[in-house]
């Protein structure tokens, strides 16, 4: 939406066709300056650009003959499109919605009207000649401190303020060359996949840094529990996450000083540890963010709850899988009791299993009989030991690495028995 800034200029984002009949529209920040009698467009809000970054295009208002809504025949696939006719050239621009389209067309037509000056306002010819003959004086440019860095083998000079911090207009070069068309919207299914609760509001805003106090454009996303901002819309990991339970207040920033004095549509998010200064693209967008954050904080206070997606994220971390534990639990529940008991016999208990450093118990135990012990089991009974009934009398069986328990009879066979085999002797 176009808005009026502190210098009484009409500002806002529009999409302009790169070349006539090319069909390629680029996102630009437009400033309609009636005092300078021109329409300017920049890569982004000049407050967010580097010092010295000028307009990428301009048009004198006196050259504009007509501003009208584009017909479907002119731009059949471009909604909310209007055309500026100037000097036998046409400029096609695209607004965000119908109201934005109507406001821009009315503002441009009003600014480009030819007005007849009143009597006494026309300058005298002598004054005009005097101004023309006067030699132009070179304006003395203010001295600006620069910080020189070597990035990737290239010398980069960044303007800084005298207090040692970043410049007020510090910004990454080339960051805003490809701005998204929609600056604030509820994302659809084709956007960045959401891994948490559904988003209440999302869009691009300009945020002040905490350390260097530089202003950079970030993609903000608001859900039921947090406010996150990303470097761009396609990023999956946020640069920072602000829990809504830590937000104390969100309102328009009315008390401004220093760099904040020239910022329009500025609001602040006050938390327990820090105050975030965020600049929206229009007053409507600013009030929408303030109302959305306030409503989410109030809903969280009235109905406190934990995010339900935290456990699902922990279960699907890299290196683990939710499918590995679920089938095992299902199979263990469906397994027959005998089979389950046999599986448990193979896994020694940590509390009761024998270890090499454990002393051999002196009390005699009755282990599992040979006929009931599996042949391939690691837990074997002592040779020759068996109960008369063949019933397991002990709670655990001896592992093959465990020493045998001392016996009263050193030889377990009776030599007078006629049924004894020679191999047993």
Curated annotation (Swiss-Prot):
Gene Ontology molecular functions: fibronectin binding; laminin binding; lipid binding; PDZ domain binding; phosphatidylinositol-3,4-bisphosphate binding
Compartments it resides in: Cytoplasm; Cell membrane; Nucleus
Domain of life per record: Eukaryota
Bias kind Basic and acidic residues: ranges: 363-375, 400-410
GO cellular component term, pick one: nucleus
Region (Disordered): 310-425
Positions of modified residues (Phosphoserine): 184, 314, 349
Assigned keywords, A-Z: Cell membrane, Cytoplasm, Isopeptide bond, Lipid-binding, Membrane, Nucleus, Phosphoprotein, Repeat, Ubl conjugation
Polar residues bias: start-end ranges: 310-331
InterPro entries: PH-like_dom_sf, PH_domain, PI-Interact_SigTrans_Reg
GO BP, one annotated term: positive regulation of cell-matrix adhesion
Every PH domain range: 7-113, 198-298
Membrane topology type: Peripheral membrane protein
Gene3D superfamilies: Pleckstrin-homology domain (PH domain)/Phosphotyrosine-binding domain (PTB) (2.30.29.30)
Record's subunit section: Binds MPDZ and PTPN13.
Protein's UniProt name: Pleckstrin homology domain-containing family A member 2
Biological source species: Mus musculus (Mouse)
């Amino acid at each position: 939406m176009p808005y009026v800034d502190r210098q009484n200029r009409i500002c806002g984002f529009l999409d302009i066709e790169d070349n006539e009949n090319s069909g390629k529209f680029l996102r630009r920040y437009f400033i309609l300056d009636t005092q300078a009698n021109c329409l300017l467009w920049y890569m982004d809000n000049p407050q967010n650009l580097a010092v010295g970054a000028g307009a990428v295009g301009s048009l004198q208002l006196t050259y504009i003959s007509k501003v009208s809504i584009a017909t479907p025949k002119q731009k059949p696939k471009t909604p909310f499109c209007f055309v500026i006719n100037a000097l036998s050239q046409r400029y096609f621009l695209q607004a965000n919605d119908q109201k934005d389209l109507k406001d821009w067309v009315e503002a441009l037509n009003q600014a480009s009207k030819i007005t007849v000056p009143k009597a006494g306002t026309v300058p005298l010819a002598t004054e005009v000649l005097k101004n023309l003959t006067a030699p132009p004086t070179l304006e003395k440019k203010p001295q600006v401190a620069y910080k020189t860095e070597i990035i990737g083998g290239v010398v980069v000079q960044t303007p800084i303020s005298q207090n040692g911090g970043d410049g007020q207009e510090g910004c990454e070069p080339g960051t805003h060359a490809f701005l998204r068309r929609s600056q604030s919207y509820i994302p659809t299914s084709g956007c960045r996949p959401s891994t948490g609760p559904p988003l209440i509001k999302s869009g691009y805003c300009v945020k002040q840094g905490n350390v260097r106090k530089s202003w950079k454009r970030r993609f903000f996303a608001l859900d039921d529990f947090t406010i996150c901002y990303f470097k761009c819309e396609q990023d999956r990991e946020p640069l920072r996450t602000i829990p809504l339970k830590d937000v104390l207040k969100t309102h328009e920033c009315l008390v401004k000083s220093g760099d904040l004095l020239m910022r329009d549509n500025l609001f602040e998010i006050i938390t327990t540890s820090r105050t975030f200064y965020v600049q929206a693209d229009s007053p409507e967008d600013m009030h929408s963010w303030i109302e959305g954050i306030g409503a989410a904080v109030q809903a969280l206070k009235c109905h406190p709850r934990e995010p339900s997606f935290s456990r699902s994220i922990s279960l699907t971390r890299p290196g683990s899988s939710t499918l590995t534990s679920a089938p095992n639990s299902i199979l263990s529940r469906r397994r027959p009791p005998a089979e389950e008991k046999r599986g448990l016999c193979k896994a020694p208990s940590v509390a009761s299993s024998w270890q090499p450093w454990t002393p051999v118990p002196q009390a005699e135990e009755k282990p599992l009989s040979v006929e009931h012990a599996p042949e391939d089991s690691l837990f074997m009974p002592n040779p020759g030991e068996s109960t008369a009934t063949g019933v397991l009398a002990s709670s655990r069986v001896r592992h093959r690495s465990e020493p045998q328990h001392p016996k009263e009879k050193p030889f377990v066979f009776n030599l007078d028995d006629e049924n004894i085999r020679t191999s047993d002797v």
